[in-house]
UniProtKB/Swiss-Prot annotation:
InterPro entries: DExx_box_DNA_helicase_dom_sf, P-loop_NTPase, RecC, RecC_C, Restrct_endonuc-II-like. It comes from the Bacteria. It comes from Mycobacterium tuberculosis (strain ATCC 25618 / H37Rv). Keywords: ATP-binding, DNA damage, DNA repair, DNA-binding, Exonuclease, Helicase, Hydrolase, Nuclease, Nucleotide-binding. GO terms for biological process: DNA recombination; double-strand break repair via homologous recombination. This is RecBCD enzyme subunit RecC. A helicase/nuclease that prepares dsDNA breaks (DSB) for recombinational DNA repair. Binds to DSBs and unwinds DNA via a highly rapid and processive ATP-dependent bidirectional helicase activity. Holoenzyme degrades any linearized DNA that is unable to undergo homologous recombination. In the holoenzyme this subunit recognizes the wild-type Chi sequence, and when added to isolated RecB increases its ATP-dependent helicase processivity. Unlike the case in E.coli, suppresses RecA-dependent homologous recombination, is instead required for single-strand annealing pathway repair of DSB.
Amino acid sequence: MALHLHRAERTDLLADGLGALLADPQPDPFAQELVLVAARGVERWLSQRLSLVLGCGPGRADGVCAGIAFRNPQSLIAEITGTLDDDPWSPEALAWPLLAVIDASLDEPWCRTLASHLGHFATTDAEAELRRGRRYSVARRLAGLFASYARQRPGLLAAWLDGDLGELPGDLAWQPPLWRALVTTVGADPPHVRHDKTIARLRDGPADLPARLSLFGHTRLACTDVQLLDALAVHHDLHLWLPHPSDELWRALAGFQGADGLLPRRQDTSRRAAQHPLLETLGRDVRELQRALPAARATDEFLGATTKPDTLLGWLQADIAGNAPRPAGRSLSDADRSVQVHACHGPARQIDVLREVLLGLLEDDPTLQPRDIVVMCPDIDTYAPLIVAGFGLGEVAGDCHPAHRLRVRLADRALTQTNPLLSVAAELLTIAETRATASQLLNLAQAAPVRAKFGFADDDLDTITTWVRESNIRWGFDPTHRRRYGLDTVVHNTWRFGLDRILTGVAMSEDSQAWLDTALPLDDVGSNRVELAGRLAEFVERLHHVVGGLSGARPLVAWLDALATGIDLLTACNDGWQRAQVQREFADVLARAGSRAAPLLRLPDVRALLDAQLAGRPTRANFRTGTLTVCTMVPMRSVPHRVVCLVGLDDGVFPRLSHPDGDDVLAREPMTGERDIRSEDRQLLLDAIGAATQTLVITYTGADERTGQPRPPAVPLAELLDALDQTTSAPVRERILVTHPLQPFDRKNVTPGALLGAKPFTFDPAALAAAQAAAGKRCPPTAFISGRLPAPPAADVTLADLLDFFKDPVKGFFRALDYTLPWDVDTVEDSIPVQVDALAEWTVGERMLRDMLRGLHPDDAAHSEWRRGTLPPGRLGVRRAKEIRNRARDLAAAALAHRDGHGQAHDVDVDLGDGRRLSGTVTPVFGGRTVSVTYSKLAPKHVLPAWIGLVTLAAQEPGREWSALCIGRSKTRNHIARRLFVPPPDPVAVLRELVLLYDAGRREPLPLPLKTSCAWAQARRDGQDPYPPARECWQTNRFRPGDDDAPAHVRAWGPRAPFEVLLGKPRAGEEVAGEETRLGALAARLWLPLLAAEGSV
């Protein structure tokens, strides 16, 4: 028996060679063949490829792949070392005894560094608890390091057991005694001893394995793996099927074969033999593998070069195979799109571009099928939602983008992305470890299994979000839950606080001026929402119970039981596989831990454990199903496809960022053959280049999607572009690198030849329509409305409509059109209020003022606001509440001094002439006076409604003495402003003028902003120049917003419109003596009668 080495530039040649080998039957017809594969995706492809060779008739490809066991190398190693069922030295199993050893050794002098890291010497309970929560994650990380030492440098562990520390840095001197204590605790042969015994056993006699074994598709093997394989080859035929990009490089490195694999990497000179730049920069893994392989081999076979197409990709592959660029005589043709690199604005645009490229390839080549295409992403979870949205929606997308007709199969996704119950489990752990914020619980309530459990519909969730916002829920279930943050005396803004408000709102209203303990009833709980309030309370109560069970220190089994109980209490699903998978994953965690999972764990420990368990993993079923395959770069990187797409090769993302573990002894002086994930990613790119048989498509973020700032490609991609420049006689970078515009509807996307090839780049009909519209005739921007709308039939006017219009005349125009202006979306806050800004102060003060006017004592009004949860907690909130209460109390006292008795409602019905009437109700009226009061600083928008009400009363009953008093805060701090008005001489004429303005303002936006127009009129009354004060009120500055910032004004005249938009000529019938501008004329008609009627208080 012997070791046989088979090499090829592509794995399809290796697969054919393996098929030829397996076609030679073994003596026992029932004996299984054993093939060890590097990844699940390779397994699926290899089985399909072998079925074209094995069991076929002459000239036919109708065979079957049977009698072959596909396994990964680690399962074989576990079998031959006797640890297939239970390996005490695997990182998952080793973490538990290591955790026990660490707990028992914290007081040992050698363990002081580790003990300090775990909070053993912490000076405060909070710090100690925080650091103790790292115990499992630290033990698991150290177990991984020890397993790495055992696999990649076993002599190191052997020396530590013998007391030889070698040149170990002083800051890592705690690791050898920890290792010795761990070996004593585990009680099994250390991994290096077990390894040596296994090698001796394999050399002495055959293992219980097939006589013929094959190892397929590997580009990196640890030194211990090579030693085991070498020993296994003594009594077995072991065939190594290695993809290697260059036979020339292999022969150039022949002198390195069988060399000591533990050469310091900085001393490795093998890169000098790599004459092609990509073999030098991307091929370190295969060079180091060649060094590690045994020199004694029965066969070292190169299976022949593949036929390369006469394209840029083919030239590149030929140069790599020949280990040198050979650009002479090569000229890139315009039609050659075999290598495409696309620079895009962020991940979403990369997917947009990818689907256009794929559709173009499918259109240009009718023989190309989706199964011939593979899409690989370094970060599959980032791109998976974008791919789902961009492809495969089928009938859901209707006649939209044709890429939706392509079916896509995603592989390697995290279990939390594919199983909603596991996603809920992860969210429960997050909530238990954090503050249970309003956003977190609302997000959890939107999860499909939770919605199904509690019957939350879309409208229900909108209502719940409104309740949470208005009841001022921020974070924490109750004061007890806040104890660890030192806020157990603060009940405000907790879920208990907000739910009490919601539930009391079922039975009583806020206006009842009653509360239960700290609960002020919430007004917005209608009688048709009582059941929803109960379901919300049930959801929060169950979640509180579950989170309470996810705390403290307890064994692993207790944690998993508590988490499973939480899932049962909070979710419902009709898909049995989801719950079965949860049970299976939890059982797998317990099985891995076995009887060693006795140490007590804390919540961060459990999160670290489950994060690893639920991470993305390859599965055989999701590869090569006839659809477009999307996966990470690991499982399919060496599987030949006609089109290979690499998406997301962004700088900082690829290669994966590698932060050396400060506790890793190997990282201090890495040796050849030892794993380096950045070098591994570079090898993945080299493998992917060789796997593309027709087209290589690469996308990356070449510009920031928000700022447009250019961004460089990933370094390996830049090296590929440099190599391509050396592949032909003239540089080709500018021809293969396509820089895409930000928007998919940019005219470049629809212009033939503007981006790629001679055809339009996009296949999206919507993008075409948008581009055509954008490229249409451009006209200068026009006004929002070019002229007045037709006058509606004259009709009666209600006082309520008139008052609404004069709150904001321009907004009144849009309201007449039923046009909704943009508004700020109210968001859910997660932070307890610690300060009260101007808007919040006005809201609180206005409420307190209204409560006092209704007869509530000022202290009770402040208490009511305290129970609302809008004020900061503790003394800060009390102080602010008193300040606001005092101002509101003074305003209320000033108003109540003029409000004798109960206010009366006066119905009015005024004949305006020409068959029109103004009708409505003025309330409240105290005797012959209306008294309005606001917490705001008294402004034109406050006095105008009072004036209109006064004029209406005077027109209704002209013989009675009427007046209107307006009270508010003065511009001078802590003073009260009062303005008194008496009726005009002819109130009906004033009403007619107001109605004329109302009619005009419903036909077009009137240049009549209230503050600006009032400032103009006041300046005219005082004999001053009206332009400066009016301009100051209109324009926004850095200290205050102006009228130009109002949403209605922005919509009518544009953002930051100049003051001159208000200064047109008066229309016919609007003229006023002395006014040459429309603003001046309208301001005079509206404000001068009011100003003339102002008296003294």
